[in-house]
Curated annotation (Swiss-Prot):
The keyword Transcription regulation applies. This is Nodulation protein D 2. Gene3D superfamilies: Periplasmic binding protein-like II, Winged helix-like DNA-binding domain superfamily/Winged helix DNA-binding domain. Belongs to the LysR transcriptional regulatory family. The lineage of its organism: Bacteria, Pseudomonadati, Pseudomonadota, Alphaproteobacteria, Hyphomicrobiales. PANTHER family: HTH-TYPE TRANSCRIPTIONAL REGULATOR LEUO (PTHR30118:SF6), HTH-TYPE TRANSCRIPTIONAL REGULATOR LEUO-RELATED (PTHR30118). Residues 6-63 form the HTH lysR-type domain. It comes from Rhizobium meliloti (strain 1021) (Ensifer meliloti).
Length: 310
């Protein structure tokens, strides 16, 4: 189909090229052969009167003109998809929808595995692609490249709708044989002890308690840094190190990795896990159905109310 001389299929190719930045991957994304994608680039260059891309090794480097076109092309394709194509009511038992979700290792273990178990029964054709925290998840959200972010509410964008899942307490833990934890844990002792800390994404975003300390000008003695909370419990036994991790994670590992919970000298540490979705997907029946599943699972009694420290 052409619109004012432009083959609209070329916009799909341009969007894939801007997303993947590699010729072969972009061709695979839109189910074209590599020669066909090369031909599409040539036609795009002719139509727009611009090179659009140059090659640097195997990577496609967009020109300023291509960078300027990309957001409008993506928005146009999303509007077509959501307004024309994706409005059929979803039938969970027959759906083969695939959802792309950014969430932490912690949420995968303590929450999302329940969602997967439920949908294996109710919607066996539905599949998921779980993604790590990216350098810029908000750009993926804006472009509609992910269906949901599941993150602490504090770190969510104000430009897209969101909903609370549950509140979570952060607790200080260490090895049960760590004699330094027998007495009161003063602020001075807390700061001087070796810590195992989680940082997230390629940019190593700090966890909530680390962000809180940095905001007040304090710096812990961090001896180990890991890319997620779930790697911390196995690294504490038989050491004198401590860590701040979600309470539900302590309970998840309590049968295999016993940990001692100690009262930390910081203000009470809580955060709210929430789910966010692209504004463009707000009325998409499939997105509405999946977010209802997430909210229903979060409303179960074990996820509501204050989490007991006992």
């Amino acid at each position: 189909m052409r619109f004012r001389g432009l083959d609209l299929n070329l916009l799909v190719a341009l969007d894939a090229l801007m997303t993947e930045r590699k010729l072969t991957a972009a061709a695979r994304r839109v189910k074209l052969s590599q020669p066909a994608m090369s031909a599409a680039i040539a036609r795009l260059r002719t139509y727009f009167g611009d090179e659009l891309f140059s090659m640097q090794g195997r990577e496609l480097i967009p020109t300023p003109r291509a960078e300027a076109l990309a957001p409008a092309v993506r928005d146009a394709l999303l509007h077509i998809q959501l307004s024309v194509i994706a409005w059929d009511p979803i039938n969970p038992a027959q759906s083969d929808r695939r959802f792309r979700i950014i969430l932490s290792d912690f949420m995968t273990l303590v929450f999302f595995e329940r969602v997967v178990e439920r949908l294996a029964r109710e919607a066996p054709g539905v599949s998921f692609e779980l993604l790590p925290l990216d350098d810029d998840p908000y750009e993926l959200l804006r472009r509609g490249d992910v269906d949901f972010l599941v993150l602490p509410d504090l770190f969510m964008s104000s430009a897209h709708p969101k909903a609370k899942l549950f509140a979570e307490a952060l607790v200080c833990v260490g090895c049960p044989t760590n004699e330094q934890l027998l007495g009161e844990l003063s602020f001075e002792k807390y700061m001087s002890m070796g810590h195992v800390a989680a940082q997230f994404g390629r940019a190593l975003k700090p966890s909530f308690e680390q962000w809180l300390l940095l905001e007040h000008g304090f710096k812990r003695r961090v001896e180990l840094v890991v890319p997620g909370f779930t790697l911390i419990p196995p690294l504490l036994p038989h050491t004198n190190r401590i860590a701040i991790i979600p309470l539900r994670l302590v309970k998840y590992f309590e049968q295999t990795i016993p940990l001692r919970i100690v009262k930390h000298p910081l203000p009470p540490l809580w955060f709210t896990e929430a789910v966010q979705w692209p504004a463009l997907h707000n009325k998409d029946p499939g997105n509405i159905w999946m977010r209802e599943i997430l909210l229903q699972e979060a409303s179960r009694s074990e996820f509501q109310g204050e989490t007991s420290l006992e």
